């Protein structure tokens, strides 16, 4: 093996749980659960799946709740955003995830990963959901023992 391709684990020095990776042209992008950390929903970039850099964040603060703003003795530790899915379709990036502290599903979209991101809320908690695109239609798939599509 050539020395320039030899990598040692961990490739990333931090914990990036629930990763989702897409490729757009010659670039890979990864999102990961960031839970209660702000700014939230980190997006990493790589050209070879071994060397990653922080590229952007989707939001500064998800909601202005006491938990997320650390007010009135409250916090969102271990809560926040979980299990993001990143997709690219017809020149637009889409990102969907749930937030344990708000009990909502959030759908963001932007033409560029640096933003600005348009935030939409979906009532309901669709944990581990995924976005699928087929013939110009978008679908949200979720479930554990049974798979649901909306």
Show where each model-derived region lies.
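Carbohydrate-active catalytic/glycan-binding domains of CAZyme proteins
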Residues: 1-150
């Amino acid at each position: 093996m050539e020395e320039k391709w030899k990598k040692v684990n961990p490739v990333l020095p931090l914990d990036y749980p629930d990763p989702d990776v897409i490729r757009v042209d010659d670039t890979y992008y990864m999102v990961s659960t960031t839970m209660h950390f702000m700014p939230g929903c980190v997006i990493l970039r790589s050209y070879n799946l071994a060397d990653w850099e922080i590229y952007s964040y989707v939001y500064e603060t998800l909601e202005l709740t006491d938990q997320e703003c650390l007010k009135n003795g409250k916090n969102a530790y271990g809560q926040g955003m979980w299990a993001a899915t990143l997709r690219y379709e017809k020149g637009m990036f889409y990102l969907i995830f749930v937030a344990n502290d708000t009990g909502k599903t959030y759908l963001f979209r932007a033409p560029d990963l640096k933003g600005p991101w348009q935030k939409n809320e979906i009532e309901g908690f669709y944990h581990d959901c995924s976005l699928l695109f087929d013939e110009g239609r978008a679908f949200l798939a979720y479930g554990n023992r049974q798979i649901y599509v909306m």
